[in-house]
Amino acid sequence: MSKSRDSYFDNAKFLLIFLVVFGHILRSFINDNHFMLYLYKFIYTFHMPAFILVSGYFAKGFKRAGYVKKLAVKLIIPYLIFQIIYSVFYYIMQDESMANVNPIDPQWSLWFLVSLFFWNLLLYPFSKLSKQWALFVSCGIAVLIGYLDFVSSTLSLSRTFVFLPMFLVGFYLNKHHFDLLRSKRGKQIALGVLAAVFVICWGIDFDYSFLFGSKPYSSFGDVTLVSGLSRIGWYVLAFGATFSFLALVPQKRYFFTKWGTRTFYVYLLHGFIIKTLRQVGLEDWLTDYQSLVILLLLTAALTSVLSSNFVKTVAQPFIELRMTSLLQFVRGTGKNAYLK
């Protein structure tokens, strides 16, 4: 890893991708286990908002020449490749509802690639506003967009606007803000906030899919003023939990820090394994609360394997559209890397 890299953000990205995988594994158990449902809601309150905020933090160079072109190559081409691969995979798994090659209807977690591309493009108009107005307008759009039934998962438009405030906040943050979060006092407050958010997820009955940001308010019942207020309330929880999580991320380099540089691989590839586990009925094998430990270990194993040098070597041509790791292995310079 380059010494110029900030271990803090690599740690944050690894922990967040761990939560992404863990959340997807938990999904199979939430219908029959109340605690896992509450834990699932808690994780979904902040794990993607935090990921999106960190993505916004690293989008400060959006005005550089060729930025959009590089972004399209990095996000849109892999999106189209994996849109086809996932559609074929779902067809093989006999999930006809998911076997869809429609390029404007993202398969499962691929929505993030489309939205990330749009968030970067939206920086051009929003950066012309003051920070306060940009956040106010983005939050206003996000609240109002839920009242429009035609804005949904197509082109990931709903999620793009719902999570846009998180991306903008990350864009406006600087290193000093993160230093404040990581202060001793900041960490103490963070623990209290996360505990409070978990209690709210435990005590308030709400549809967990509201946290996805992918559906209009009409999907959850009668559409009233409360619908928009509910989204505002979620923003309070999401930002509070997101900042609290980031306050607790360690700054030192650990064995998992380097894996934080390969979250894109984990994000794109873990869906194949998750779908397979669901297909074989993992929830029928693990039904007790003790299974939570097994699920955590399974998540750790899956995340570490998909972050490995071997997976990078095999998948790099499809994900990064280059063969650097494979060529290094062929030349003999990367053979020992598989064991690292």
Curated annotation (Swiss-Prot):
Organism name: Bacillus subtilis (strain 168)
Protein name as catalogued: Putative membrane-bound acyltransferase YkrP
Keyword Acetylation attached: no
Major location (coarse): membrane
EC number: 2.3.-.-
Compartment(s) of residence: Cell membrane
Bilayer topology: Multi-pass membrane protein
Keywords in alphabetical order: Acyltransferase, Cell membrane, Membrane, Transferase, Transmembrane, Transmembrane helix
Residue ranges crossing the lipid bilayer per the database entry: 6-26, 35-55, 73-93, 106-126, 133-153, 161-181, 192-212, 229-249, 263-282, 291-311
Family statement drawn from the similarity comment of this UniProt entry: Belongs to the acyltransferase 3 family.
Domain of life: Bacteria
Example of a GO MF term: acyltransferase activity, transferring groups other than amino-acyl groups
One CC-aspect GO term: plasma membrane
Coiled-coil segments: none
Keyword Acyltransferase: yes
Lineage per the UniProt record: Bacteria, Bacillati, Bacillota, Bacilli, Bacillales
Broad EC category: transferase
